[in-house]
Amino acid sequence: MKKNNNWILPVAFIIFIIFWKFISDEQPVPNPKIEIYNSSIESIIDVSSEIEVLADSISLPEGPVWDSNSKSLLFVDVMGNKLYKWNETDGPSEYISPSGNTGYAPNVDFGLLGANGLVINSDGNIVICQHGDRRVALIENTPSTNPKFVTVVDNFEGKKFNSPNDLVYSSDGSFYFTDPAFGFFNLQTFQFVEDEVKNLDFNGVYNFNPNDNKLSLVTKEIDLPNGIGLSPDNNTLYVNKMGLLDGNPRIISINLETNESSILFDGKELSESYEGNFDGMTVHSSGNIFTSGPGGLLVISPEGDLMAKIDFGHLTNATFDDDESYLYVTGFVNNPKVYRIKLN
């Protein structure tokens, strides 16, 4: 009697499907927007993580910082002169208005006059860089449509700052900040404009200690300093040099014991292939620098090696939450969104 083997193919097909599903479940699909150049960074970056959009239609989002007290992300709209708050329950909402231009200091009408970099100090207060008011200030009452700003520092040797841009606190209670002239930048013509109300003829990087009100000029040799960060041991200061003026975007490393500067990472080659600038940055507890740059978000090791790139589009800044389980980033005017991605 001839055996009927017609059942073999259907059963084999079912086994194959089950096996394929098992393999697929066990092997997450890598996100094509994440490029890994050094496998050691995979201890931090999950190559299968998806990019989430948290907010859009913000004219120029910037200055993201995680507020551990309210479990919220704070960020500003530089062009809209507002500060926003995002959390899992409510999504994005307007939190403080105005944020960076209140009439405190003379400025020009066409500049980028809203706030920019933010930090939460040890007392839980927001310390904010204000382009329009040309100072670093502390916000006393939040949330508010009539916020009270207290000046922390607003001049160098009696001359008003340009447009304080970004800042980072040191473990000794002082903070470092950058002072490029974006309050005098015409976004229509994409040019910096000299004006009689501009008092300083350089773009500085400073240290200010609120305990004794001592202001020190760290360097004035970086033509357009922007994002700023500190190594975990607080011995090295990182400053993003945008390169808009000379075409040489770089990350500058400053030894705070010797005050010697060096080029940590040269972004010129990347800038010839990708859109984006060395704008804001944040430093991971591992010492790796997560910075906006050509191609999106770049991860640079303390030794200056490119570890990874995540294609969020053209970015302005980045930050982590308390336990570094998420990375939050903000986009430029041609990419006006706030994103996050899950980390390992």
Model regions and ranges:
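N-terminal Sec-pathway targeting helices
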Residues: K2-V11
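N-terminal leader/targeting segments
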Residues: V11-A12, A115
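Hydrophobic alpha-helical membrane-insertion segments, chiefly the h-region
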Residues: F13-F22
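Sequence-structural signature of mature extracellular/luminal beta-sheet repeat domains
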Residues: K21-N344
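Short linear motifs centered on Gly/Pro in flexible linkers and helix caps
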Residues: M1-K2, F175
